[in-house]
Amino acid sequence: MNIQAKYRHLGFTLIELLITVLIVAILAAVAYPSYMDSVQKSRRTTARNALLDLASREAKFYSTNNTFTSSMNTDLGYASAGPIAIPDATSHYYDLTITASSATGFTAQAAPVGPQATDGCGTYTIDNLNSKVAAQSNCW
């Protein structure tokens, strides 16, 4: 009897375990949406940076050739003609393309794909005049 009394308080009761699991589940339910928002914001930043890089490459090409180009692989140094998967083919969240190009201007866009397609900012667009457009005004 003495041994049973000694070991009776060494474990957790089922109620204590259930309360702990409930607290962890509530914390996870609150934290997960916030985490996903942060992930989407990070992907948006990657898309904007890719568009700015494309605009920079177009400006460099224009300064050398006095015309803009739509040839992403030949003239701008990308691996393929487009669309370019952003950030890469294994983690594909945006498609980078030149949607319009002439001797005097260009328009490029980063369109969301896959899990990023539900993002409220939608497609990012930039042109040779550095006009930046997105679905919401606070996205750029």
Named regions from a protein language model:
Residues 2, 60-140:
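Periplasmic/extracellular, small/polar-rich flexible segments of pilin-like filament-forming proteins
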Residues 15-25, 44-53, 77:
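Short, charged low-complexity linear motifs
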Residues 1-7:
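N-terminal secretory signal peptides that target proteins for export/translocation
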Residues 1, 34-37, 41, 50-53, ...:
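Helix-centric, low-specificity signal for extended rod-like, repetitive segments
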Residues 40-67:
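Membrane-proximal N-terminal amphipathic helix
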